[in-house]
């Protein structure tokens, strides 16, 4: 996990946030130098210090707070600096030393420290024990394997060291836990999880003997790292930090867990969302209304409508906002009919809707392509509930028309509005016109938007593209990301159209060709107009096989458990041919596939999609 894991400076780990990297690096350097390399052979200090008390005895005598602990460690590290350099230089100048000479020079002066240290940091070697060159080399090898992220060999090396009586130190265990958490995707996840549990148990054993002041200081650092990961959207690393804090007997509070839940929704981390929900449920026996709303929003943004419905049904208290969230969740994830049914249930329970709830219904009708029902609800809004339509309601109605592609009707509705359409109305129509390929109408709307509010149009909008937020441009760094796959061995992978450099390239495309044969048998006809190159028909069909979402689909089928659902996230709108192909392939392999493009979620199962082919 941390930067200083061996006798010599190493490259900084990507796990550390920029804000704390230098400070923690310096702290760990001081800690490793002062605690893990105590020189019991130093004539000036040996008479003052009982090896059975360890360095922590000095901390208790000289300090009273976590800040003073850090200062004490720093002071001790300075006193040991010259001796450390002398020993390292001696090692380099004497490569042919015998084991006995190594034992003589390095007795008590390397990573081996007193097993009775109350802070539990370091190895379990007593000051009277000696270390041979073989163990020393194995420790150096372990550090190198961690730097190279070679999980398999690092675990094997740790087992060999334990057989020789060396107990891994606290910092190295943290690093190894990180590698087990983020391990190589081609290494068996079951092995990594088993190793992670084992390593966390070792950390917990060390923490049980950790001195209180040092434990508080180290815990504070880990909490700062957790907050930094949440701030920068690093969900997996934040979850890893929670595991480390749990092994240190620290329970993350509910407010921090809810913050992570919001980040999961923004990052669309499906498995992580369920993990965070489990940790939240374990931390408190009863969630209040606002906490449940966070969970509903998280599952809604991740495309997990069933999980959101489960949270909704378990809620003992609901208000108007609760119903708005669940109706919007069903609508945006392709369950428009369920959204309408939920609205009917809302009215049957004697509740009175507001404009926001009706806007959710308009959106659901638009996703269903049922404009007529949406207009009936619009009439009911003012007739039955006395709600005067606002400009936000008219924006939602324009969206309802345009979502299924009724662009001419949407323009006619705008021209018949009883109030002057504002920039939001024209911007909504502009975006959806370009999504559906009506560039002429999109350009016309763009001219109106520029006249009303020029700040609404960025460079992409003026050039005829769908407007994107500045934050999205920064996040993507203007780099095209194609199919992103969630759910394969609890990992996320990225694919690009036509990528032939994958480790399993032959198997992937062979599977796609076999699936195509079965698809043709059930009536599939390739939409070759989606292949824009000037090539023959057969070449176009071959080109379509290399679309990123199909590669992601094949990768999931080959590398995940049978019948297990998975998710494909597309950075652009899913093309018609891939949409049809994914529906049929999901039926052939018996999988549920959740596909997310720039417009909506598609949940494909048994050859059908929740979007009803409206997207």
UniProtKB/Swiss-Prot annotation:
Segments of this protein annotated with the region Type DYW motif: 521-615
Amino acid composition bias (Polar residues), ranges on this chain: 58-98
PPR repeats (start-end): 288-318, 319-353, 354-389, 390-420
GO molecular function, one term: zinc ion binding
Keywords for this protein: Repeat
Gene Ontology BP terms: RNA modification
Annotated region (Type E(+) motif), positions in chain: 490-520
Region (Disordered): 40-98
Pfam families, alphabetized: DYW_deaminase, PPR
Top-level taxon: Eukaryota
Similarity remark: Belongs to the PPR family. PCMP-H subfamily.
Name of the protein in question: Pentatricopeptide repeat-containing protein At2g25580
